[in-house]
Amino acid sequence: MKLDAATTAVPPGPFVHEEWPYEPRFKRVNSWRMHYIDEGAGDPVVLLHGNPAWGFLYRKFVKPLTAAGRRVIVPDMIGFGLSEKPVREQAHSLDGHIANLTGLLRQLDIRNATMVCHDWGGPTGLGFALSNPDRVRALVIMSTWAWPLPPAEFHKRIFPWRMMNAPLIGPYLLGRHNALAGRGMYLSVVDRTRFRDEAQSVYEGILPDPAARLLTWTWPRWIPLDDTARGFRRFEWLERELRKSKFPTLLVGGREDEVFDHKTFATRFKELLPHAVGPELVTGRHFLQEDSGAEIAEKINHFLDRIDGSKP
């Protein structure tokens, strides 16, 4: 039986529609209504967001990528953006998000794709790629991870994890007050004045009430800090399968990233993917797309051109 879901409209305002003028599209995946945009033609580039963002995070990527002759697909994960938002935690799991993404991309018959993976879009997109290698051409990995995390390391990096897991504080701050989409994102960009003036209300407005914000504080509970965690086996699988993969891979890092610092996490990814290029560094904290979106898009274009052999 389908669970109840919250629905959302695009936050009003000229800035949103100027920066995100794309036709909204929807597919039914695993009983949920999933939103995405599909622009341009050519080999597809799939841009994947995490928590608490939505496709709007990639607004500075679409034009540079389509201008280079690429098809750009930007889904909103179930629970975010314009996709349906299940109001029960049981509807959410990493395996479920991988299955939802798989359902969408198979319906679109996506092949030869480049998966651009950020935050929870990392384990989700990598889960798709490793399960569907015949549909994937290359990987772009930034500010994410794909293995179980030691508790001490994770707590040191992401203090709010403790709030998210507290029985009352997480729902109160992140659910009732939308703290992750507001203050959390604000603290995770470099140019905070621009973000506050232009974009912060867009991320807050797409999650308008506590029911719509469920995933902002429940999804982090799937981060595997020990072998009893719900997502531990899936992250073990990701780590193991990445070692076997041969996808051309570009690593991108924000110089100021406080969540997944490029030295620690790029080193780990290069241990798993010794053929990976990078890390290519840009101005940015965790949400590096906000500060350096167009620059990252051009790095992706250059990386894919090198794969094609069209540029040195």
Give the positions of each predicted feature.
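Short hydrophobic "strand-cap" motifs at the C-terminus of beta-strands
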Residues: 48, 252, 284-285
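Short amphipathic alpha-helical segment that frequently serves as the phosphate-/nucleotide-binding helix
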Residues: 52, 266-267, 297
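Catalytic active-site module of serine/aspartate enzymes centered on a nucleophile-bearing elbow/loop
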Residues: 275-312
